[in-house]
Amino acid sequence: METFICRPERGGPFPAVFLLMDAPGIREELRDMARRLGTVGYYVLLPNLYYRAGRDTIFGPDVLEEGSVERDRMRSVRTKMTIPPVMNDVATMLTYVDRQSEIKRGPVGCHGYCMSGPYALAAAARYPDRIAAAASFYGTWLVSDAEESPHLSLSKVKGELYIACAEHDALAPLPMVEELRTLFGRAGTAGEIELYPGVHHGFAFPQRWCYDKPAAERLWERLIALYRRCLG
C-alpha cells in the first residue's frame, strides 16, 4: 500500500495520525494537508486506499469535472470501496507505527474526508483501544442501510469523535445529520457533531470551487485541538 509519510524534521517521537483520502484520491492538495499536520508535531500517514485497483489510480485535475473521463474512471474505482478492506489497511498502518522509533507509543488519530469520513469513524469503533481520536469531514452517508454503516458501531468507540457536516451536501443531507445527532447521543459517544452553515461538500479543499477559507480554518482548529487533547 503506497503511503505518503510526513513528520517534523526535529524532535520526536511524535504521535501518529492517519489521514484518509477523499474520492478524487491522492494528489498534492492532500499531501499539503499532511505537511500542515507535520508542522505541528504529528507523524502523518496518507495511504492510497485505491491500491487494490492497480497502479493507475492517480487521477488528473479534471477528475472534479462532471462527465470527464477521469471522473468516470475514478467512480469505477470508488464504487468498489467498502469498509472491511479499509479496516485491514488501518490494521496494517497500526502494525507499521508500532515498529517505528520515531513514533510515540500510545494512542493514534484518524480522520477522513468525503468517502473516508465513514472509514475514520469505523476505525475508531474497530480499534477502540488504539484510536483515541477520529474525525469525519463532510463524510458521506454516515447513517445508511448498509451492514457496515458507521452509526451502528458508535457505542464501541472509546475515543473522542468530531464530525463536521456541510449545510449544503447531497451526500450527507440535513435529515441524516439530525438522525446522526440522535444516534450519537443515544450511544453516549464522546465528541461533537458540528454543522457548518452556508458551505458545500468539499469546502475544506483549497482547489475546489466551494472552498471556504474561514470554515476550512475552523476545521483545522477543531482537528488540531482534538489531536492535542487526545494524542498530545
Residue spans for each PLM region:
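N-terminal cap/leader regions of alpha/beta-hydrolase-fold enzymes
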Residues: 1-232
